[in-house]
């Protein structure tokens, strides 16, 4: 299937926060309560629609273990979007966010769009991180923020789509130069030049 743009994502965060579950729910609409730990990097893809244009998302799901961090670092380069995930029932995963974010910004493009996801919001009775704390962290660091549940699918699609919509808007607004961002690839009938030429043709009949 052809696309207007291809955006590359990376999912990061501590082990066990539900990164692989979020990806599986988004791409396959499936939830696995017991999921093998990611060894290195896993991959998923899905095409969504933004502004009536097909956008292909290629998503790399990374291992959270310290022993794989060097592998993860090499995948930051050439990513247009990052999903930074913590578990609302495990405060230590929230406390580690600053370290993950610093590493991402050190190795990735300065124009990378980052979505902060507080996962497992279906476990409200076990919550140890408040929604307000997540909102404050996102605000302080210039991130988008959502709480989600890979189990119930709450905000899973929305998180991936909102990240893409933000990247797309930044391209259209000229904040991000698609030609100089390896994580963004105009498709066969995509890109700003294509959309503007289509508009010109439309105006001329």
Swiss-Prot record:
Q: Can you say what this protein is called?
A: Ras-related protein RABB1a
Q: Where is the lipid attached (S-geranylgeranyl cysteine)?
A: 203-204
PROSITE patterns the UniProt entry points to? RAB
Name the NCBIfam families for this protein: small_GTP
* Naturally occurring in which organism (per UniProt): Arabidopsis thaliana (Mouse-ear cress)
List, as start-end ranges, the regions of compositional bias called Polar residues: 194-205
PANTHER family to which the protein is assigned, alphabetical: DRAB11-RELATED
Q: Which GO terms describe its cellular component?
A: plasma membrane
Q: Which family does it belong to?
A: Belongs to the small GTPase superfamily. Rab family.
Any idea which positions bind GTP? 13-20, 61-65, 119-122, 149-150
**Domain of life where this protein originates:** Eukaryota
Q: Which SUPFAM superfamilies match?
A: P-loop containing nucleoside triphosphate hydrolases
Report the residue ranges where the short sequence motif Effector region is annotated in this entry: 35-43
Topology of this chain in the membrane: Lipid-anchor
Per its UniProt record, what SMART domains does this chain match? RAB, RAN, RAS, RHO
Q: Which InterPro entries match?
A: P-loop_NTPase (IPR027417), Rab_GTPases_membrane_traffic (IPR050209), Small_GTP-bd (IPR005225), Small_GTPase (IPR001806)
Alphabetically list the UniProt keywords. Answer: Cell membrane, GTP-binding, Lipoprotein, Membrane, Nucleotide-binding, Prenylation, Protein transport, Transport
Instruction: Answer yes or no on keyword Disulfide bond.
Output: no
């Amino acid at each position: 299937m052809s696309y207007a743009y291809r955006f590359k994502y990376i999912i990061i965060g501590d082990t066990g926060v539900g990164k692989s579950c979020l990806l599986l729910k988004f791409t396959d609409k499936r939830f696995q309560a017991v999921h093998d730990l990611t060894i290195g990097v896993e991959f998923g893809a899905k095409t969504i629609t933004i502004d009536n244009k097909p956008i292909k998302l290629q998503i790399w799901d990374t291992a959270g273990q310290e022993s794989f961090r060097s592998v993860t670092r090499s995948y930051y380069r050439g990513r247009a979007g990052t999903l930074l995930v913590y578990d609302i029932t495990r405060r230590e995963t929230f406390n580690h966010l600053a370290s993950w974010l610093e590493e991402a910004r050190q190795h990735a493009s300065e124009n990378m769009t980052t979505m902060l996801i507080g996962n497992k919001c279906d476990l409200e009775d076990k919550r140890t991180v408040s929604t307000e704390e997540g909102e404050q962290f996102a605000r302080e660091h210039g991130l988008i923020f959502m709480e989600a549940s890979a189990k119930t699918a709450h905000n899973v699609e929305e998180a991936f789509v909102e990240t893409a919509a933000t990247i797309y808007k930044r391209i259209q607004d000229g904040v991000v130069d698609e030609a100089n961002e390896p994580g963004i690839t105009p498709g066969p009938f995509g890109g700003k030049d294509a959309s503007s030429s289509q508009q010109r043709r439309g105006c001329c009949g």
